[in-house]
Amino acid sequence: SCLTIANFWLPEIAGKFARACPDTPLEITVDIVSRVAAMLAANKIDIALYEGAVPDARFRAREFSSYRIGWLAAPDHPLAKQKQIPLSEALRHPLLLREKGSAVRSTFDSTLLLHGLKAEARWTSVNSQALVRGALGGAGICVIPEIIAANELAAGRLVRLDIAAEPMVNKNFIVYHPDKYLSPQASKLIEIVLTVSPGDQAVK
C-alpha cells in the first residue's frame, strides 16, 4: 500500500478482510508509490493499493477513492489572504514538500511541468505530518493531501492558498495482474476495497 492510503483507507480494508477471511493473514507492506510499483512489476506482491497515475498498462487498475492535494500555510502567511496567486509567485516562498518518488510529489511536479516551472524544496520529508507541523510553525507552504491536515484546516490553524492552477487530485486504485490467478481470498479483498467508504476527501 502507498502511504496516504495506508493512513486513511487501509485500516478499514484490513479490518473488513480480517472479519471476512479470519484464517487468511494479510501481509502488508507500506512504501512510497515508486517502490510499490516496482514490487508489483517484480511479482513480489500480488495486489497493490496505489495512488496517482498507474505506471504500467499491463496491470488491471480499478479506482476506489481519491484525495485532493492542497497548498497549505499558516493564517499569517503573506499569501494567505491573496486571491488567484500565480504559481510562479507561490514558488518564490519556502516550500515544504514530500520526497521525490511519492505520489504526492509526482503529482505536484507534473503540475509544475505543465507550466514550465520547477520547485526547490526548503524541507523534504517522507512524513506529511512533519510538513504540517512545519507549516503550523511558519516555516513555509506545505503541499500535502488535504485529508492529512483536515483538523488544522477546520480549526483555522492552516488555510488553503488560492493558487491559480489546476486542482491537484490523486486517484486511488487497487492494482493487480489481470492474467494472474486470484484466489477466493484475493477476490474478496478486491471486493472489499471497491466497497470501502471513499472518505470525506472523495473527489466526484
Where are these regions (language model features)?
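Short beta-strand->loop
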Residues: S1-L3, R60-G70, P94-K100, C142, A155-M168
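A late-sequence structural motif
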Residues: W9, L72, V159-A202
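Hydrophobic hinge/microswitch elements
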Residues: I32-A37, A41-I45, Y50-E51, S106-L161
